[in-house]
């Protein structure tokens, strides 16, 4: 199999780190992104990219095109979560959640698609969540961001089909990644007399299920199979 040029966002931890390493081990040319570090992970070349910043995205895409001449696969994995009651969410919390999880996907696709259309081939894999097919209490804006990714991906798949660009959705359930430890918590909800106790109890259940979830390598294996298939 000819090595593919693959770009994966959020590659410094969790699904992104495992998947980028697995794809690299299979002989692919893998570029990973992180907001903070450009230190390479073995054969995975890391680039500093903020998916909410179009300038940093364009700079990274330009570097890959300059070095490789193409991008065969884009894996939109970067994401974050804020736990709290929908009613008490601040405008900033909502903005951060949607900017990263939804508009980050939009920004990356818009940057890569011109090259895929020109090549008349390409593959975009968007990492959604079980939270993108059902609303999860106290994770409401996370769910909303993933529902948005679902609708966007389904529409995009139809629009770019004539250019031989495939768009795939992956909807993981509970996995033991660093997502649990990195989840932001709404202090307004935690301290609220009506929501607080219910929120903390819900959070305990979610965190227990995540810590007892599957190893992220299982999802990485599924993504590797999607990359390998001509028509996933």
Each PLM stretch: what is its role?
Residues 12-13:
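Conserved glycine-rich cofactor-binding loop
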Residues 109, 145-148:
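Active-site helix of classical SDR
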Residues 129:
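Residue(s) in the substrate-gating loop at a strand-loop-helix junction
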Residues 63-76, 82:
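A glycine-rich helix->loop->beta "capping" turn
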Residues 49-59, 91-92:
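The beta1-alpha1 cofactor-binding region of Rossmann-like NAD(H)/NADP(H)-dependent oxidoreductases
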Residues 85-86, 90-95:
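Substrate-binding pocket helix/loop in short-chain dehydrogenase/reductase
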Residues 162-232:
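SDR active-site lid
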């Amino acid at each position: 199999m000819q090595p593919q040029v693959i770009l994966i966002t959020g590659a410094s931890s969790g699904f992104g780190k495992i998947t980028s390493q697995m794809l690299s081990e299979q002989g692919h040319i893998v570029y990973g992104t992180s907001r903070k570090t450009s230190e390479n992970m073995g054969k995975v070349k890391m680039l500093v990219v903020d998916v909410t910043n179009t300038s940093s995205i364009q700079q990274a895409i330009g570097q890959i095109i300059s070095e490789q001449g193409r991008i065969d696969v884009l894996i939109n994995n970067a994401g974050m979560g804020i736990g709290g009651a929908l009613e008490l969410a601040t405008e900033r919390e909502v903005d951060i959640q949607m900017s990263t999880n939804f508009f980050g996907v939009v920004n990356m696709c818009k940057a890569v698609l011109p090259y895929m259309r020109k090549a008349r081939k390409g593959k975009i894999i968007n990492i959604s969540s079980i939270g993108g097919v059902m609303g999860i209490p106290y994770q409401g804006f996370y769910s909303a961001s993933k529902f948005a990714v679902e609708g966007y991906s389904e529409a995009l798949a139809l629009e770019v089909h004539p250019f031989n660009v495939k768009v795939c959705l992956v909807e993981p359930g509970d996995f033991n990644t660093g997502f649990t430890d990195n989840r932001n918590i709404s202090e307004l909800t935690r301290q609220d007399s009506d929501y607080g106790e219910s929120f903390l109890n819900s959070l305990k259940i979610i965190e227990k299920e995540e810590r007892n979830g599957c190893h992220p390598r299982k999802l990485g294996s599924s993504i590797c199979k999607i990359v390998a298939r001509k028509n996933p």
